[in-house]
């Protein structure tokens, strides 16, 4: 139920960001509203690049530290890449180390899920390294299905558990 509410919230936030970004207001020569056309409380990529470099957009993306995956997949979603771009910018040259924790849903064997969690963490690692982050700053851990955030036995719960968490 929470994931459905989050999905509705994210869709509403995206619609609001697009509407604000496309509306014209007199008196603001920049073409941006008071908040740069971005809902700072929005989830994944609410602005989708309409106001690149906006501080509020970067702050919203920086707050995203959990990246979700489709069933039996380790492919990064575009919204995850946008958030990871901001994290990469922060990590480059900082020397700060982070842990990438790979997780899966409960389906499948323990061994399979440990490997899938590792593939997911490695996908995030590869992306960050391609953005210029030193591999020495990134530690990988796979928990497989051992640390679920949702304990239900349905698609909504499984979707919440298919993730990589970036821990500073």
From Swiss-Prot:
The Tol-Pal system is composed of five core proteins: the inner membrane proteins TolA, TolQ and TolR, the periplasmic protein TolB and the outer membrane protein Pal. They form a network linking the inner and outer membranes and the peptidoglycan layer. It is a lipid-anchor. This is Peptidoglycan-associated lipoprotein. PROSITE patterns: OMPA_1, OMPA_2, PROKAR_LIPOPROTEIN. The lineage of its organism: Bacteria, Pseudomonadati, Pseudomonadota, Gammaproteobacteria, Pseudomonadales. Residues 147-168 are annotated as: Disordered. A lipid is attached at residue 22 (S-diacylglycerol cysteine). Residues 56-168 form the OmpA-like domain. Keywords: Cell cycle, Cell division, Cell outer membrane, Lipoprotein, Membrane, Palmitate, Signal. One of its GO terms (biological process) is cell division. It is found in: Cell outer membrane. It comes from Pseudomonas aeruginosa (strain ATCC 15692 / DSM 22644 / CIP 104116 / JCM 14847 / LMG 12228 / 1C / PRS 101 / PAO1).
């Amino acid at each position: 139920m929470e994931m459905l509410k989050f999905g509705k919230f994210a869709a509403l936030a995206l619609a609001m960001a697009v509407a604000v970004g496309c509306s014209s207001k007199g008196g603001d020569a920049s073409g941006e509203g008071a908040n740069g056309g971005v809902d700072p409380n929005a989830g994944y990529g609410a602005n989708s690049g309409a106001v690149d470099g906006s501080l509020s957009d970067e702050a919203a993306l920086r707050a995203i530290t959990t990246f979700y995956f489709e069933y039996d997949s380790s492919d990064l979603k575009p919204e995850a890449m946008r958030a990871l771009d901001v994290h990469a910018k922060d990590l480059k040259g900082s020397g700060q180390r982070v842990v990438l924790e790979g997780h899966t849903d409960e389906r499948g064997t323990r061994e399979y899920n440990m490997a899938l969690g590792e593939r997911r963490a490695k996908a995030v690692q590869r992306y960050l390294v391609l953005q210029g982050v030193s591999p020495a700053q990134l530690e990988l851990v796979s928990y497989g299905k051992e640390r679920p955030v949702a304990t239900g036995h349905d698609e909504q719960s499984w979707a919440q558990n298919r993730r990589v968490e970036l821990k500073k």
